Amino acid sequence: MASHKLVLDDLMEDLSFSLIGIHCNLEDYKLAYLINKALDINLKRNENDLTFKNGASYSFFEWENEKELKHWSLVSNIYKQEIKITESKGSLFSNEITTRTIPLIPEYRKVNYFLKICDEIQSINETKILNTIYNIPQVVTAYMINHEQLTSKGNLIF
């Protein structure tokens, strides 16, 4: 009996999507609200965050536009994990809490959020969307990212 293997690179080639990196200091719900208002879309918080085996969990908003065959996803790139470190100093123990940041896409660790737009009929105007997001006053910068060159593109399958 023949076996069929799916290769991640083959799967990613079949996907047609645009990826926008967004830098801002806003909470996830506030950015989703401002993007909804600016682009006239309806991103809603998913019941389940995007969670990985290493314990990292990223906030996740999505909206399916069935009329235009587009799927919008806003995902946080930053997960902060508090780690308790116990150090021995003589006969006393010192407990110290440090924060470790785990990015969803390590190649873009400075990006706060990613907006992923899956478009089945490839009718999206990337420039218009990018300019609209860039013109949100609380957004520091936003730019297109070539997802084909990412080594961690498997993290974008959701």
Q: Model regions: which residues?
A:
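Surface-exposed, low-hydrophobicity interaction/linker segments
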Residues: 50-97
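Short, flexible, solvent-exposed loop/turn segments with mixed acidic/basic and small polar residues
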Residues: 5-13, 99-110
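Primarily extracytoplasmic/secreted proteins
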Residues: 23, 63, 106, 111, ...
